[in-house]
């Protein structure tokens, strides 16, 4: 078996001094060395150095397949680094990796935190809202930042969302001669002159965590009244049974609340909606929950809008189901995929009863009532009943 042509080398802020002998040998043998400007300088790559293109692309590395090439990355190349991007396109024998201590390991070591109990997030290229589902009293998070100035922005975001009492540590240039760790609270954050690479450690306090169960309060979502109500949504999510990595079609998405909760459970979603104002609400909710990488809005009419979509693992139809929409969905479902349809009109109820008789599954009638003033007393105020059909292909 031939030697790997590509060496993926993790580099710390201590540069060459922090490399072991095997990594040094691999770097010395490379004809071409790829990396960011800072890494190339730390490794003293000289004329062999090639900066990454903007936007980032590994094609220049792959074009040199067979020649001795080294790629430099921060710390562990497989934590928000180039390592995973490269190895996904290479055979196992083509590469060898030499990881160094990553920033999260160094941060945990400085603070004495157990990594297995700490949330580690790369917020250098992701919205701060990605942190929201993880915030709970006493929760600890290590957040990689775009640059030192982003520490102030993240602290301000925490304070704005009710977590101003959280303790935060701005951790700069860990492992190098310019290492610095400074502490504050999110609300009182006034740390200046931060340098990169930077990380903000957070010990959460003071806010209201998101519930972990299905059926989040409607007040958390932007909507125009067209939203699956919390108790019905909880039953709907139970019927959809989201599993990590699965894809949901949310047809007639309204506010996107079902899609949002499906994604919070680890899935992905395509929210199909026709009305522009509701599309705007869904997009606002996607930003609010930091789900830009999991939830995509598809503006269009079903069934036509479904034609180009990838095959789903689950489908939810919250309104507007008719025979044509059902036929389009049913034709695309793979064996084992789930379909959940809710209806409130007599026409939709009749269709669901017919489909249940033909295809089986479970037909459920959901009737809810809330206590409300009735003169000087209280009485039950019923909501419109919802008929829910659940079936597995």
What are the residue ranges of the model-derived segments?
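Conserved SAM-binding loop of SAM-dependent methyltransferases across substrates and taxa
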Residues: 255-267
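S-adenosyl-L-methionine
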Residues: 272-314
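Class I SAM-dependent methyltransferase SAM-binding "motif I" and its flanking Rossmann-like core
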Residues: 75-138, 299, 303-304, 357-378, ...
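A contiguous loop/helix-start segment that scaffolds small-molecule binding in enzyme catalytic cores
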Residues: 2-10, 21-25, 67-69, 138-225, ...
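Class I S-adenosyl-L-methionine
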Residues: 1-106, 266, 273, 296-308
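C-terminal substrate-binding/active-site "lid" region of AdoMet-derived donor-dependent transferases
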Residues: 328-387
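Conserved class I S-adenosyl-L-methionine
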Residues: 245-254
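Conserved alpha-helix/loop element of class I SAM-dependent methyltransferases that forms part
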Residues: 227-244
């Amino acid at each position: 078996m031939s030697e790997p042509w590509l060496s993926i080398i993790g580099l710390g802020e201590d540069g060459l001094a922090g490399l072991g002998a095997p990594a040094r040998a691999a770097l010395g043998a490379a004809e071409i060395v790829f990396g960011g400007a800072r890494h190339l300088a730390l490794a003293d790559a000289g004329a062999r150095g090639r900066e990454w293109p903007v936007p980032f692309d590994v094609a220049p590395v792959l074009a040199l397949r067979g020649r001795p090439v080294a790629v430099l990355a921060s710390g562990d190349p497989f934590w928000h680094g180039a390592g995973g991007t490269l190895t996904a396109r290479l055979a196992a024998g083509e590469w060898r990796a030499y990881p160094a201590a990553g920033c999260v390991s160094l941060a945990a070591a400085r603070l004495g935190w157990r990594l297995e109990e700490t949330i580690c997030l790369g917020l250098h290229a992701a919205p701060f809202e990605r942190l929201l589902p993880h915030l709970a009293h006493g929760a600890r998070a290590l957040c990689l930042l775009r640059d030192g100035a982003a520490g102030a922005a993240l602290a301000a975001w925490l304070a704005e969302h009710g977590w101003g009492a959280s303790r935060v540590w701005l951790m700069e240039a860990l492992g190098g001669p310019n290492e610095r760790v400074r502490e504050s609270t999110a609300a009182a954050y006034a740390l200046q002159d931060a340098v990169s690479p930077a990380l903000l450690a957070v010990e959460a306090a003071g806010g209201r965590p998101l519930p972990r169960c299905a059926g989040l309060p409607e007040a958390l979502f932007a909507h125009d009244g067209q939203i699956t109500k919390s108790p019905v949504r909880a039953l709907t999510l139970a019927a959809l049974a989201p599993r990590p990595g699965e894809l949901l079609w949310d047809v007639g998405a309204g506010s996107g609340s079902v899609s949002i909760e499906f994604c919070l459970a680890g899935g992905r979603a395509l929210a199909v909606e026709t009305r522009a104002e509701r599309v705007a609400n869904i997009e606002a909710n996607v930003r609010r929950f930091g789900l830009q990488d999991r939830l995509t809005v598809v503006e269009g009419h079903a069934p036509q809008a479904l034609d180009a979509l990838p095959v789903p693992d689950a489908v939810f139809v919250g309104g507007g189901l008719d025979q044509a929409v059902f036929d389009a969905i049913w034709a695309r479902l793979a064996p084992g995929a789930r379909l959940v349809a809710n209806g409130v009109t007599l026409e939709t109820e009749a269709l669901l009863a017919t489909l249940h008789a033909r295809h089986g599954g479970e037909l459920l009638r959901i009737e809810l009532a809330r206590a409300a003033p009735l003169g000087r007393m209280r009485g039950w105020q019923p909501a419109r009943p919802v008929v829910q059909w659940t079936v597995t292909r």
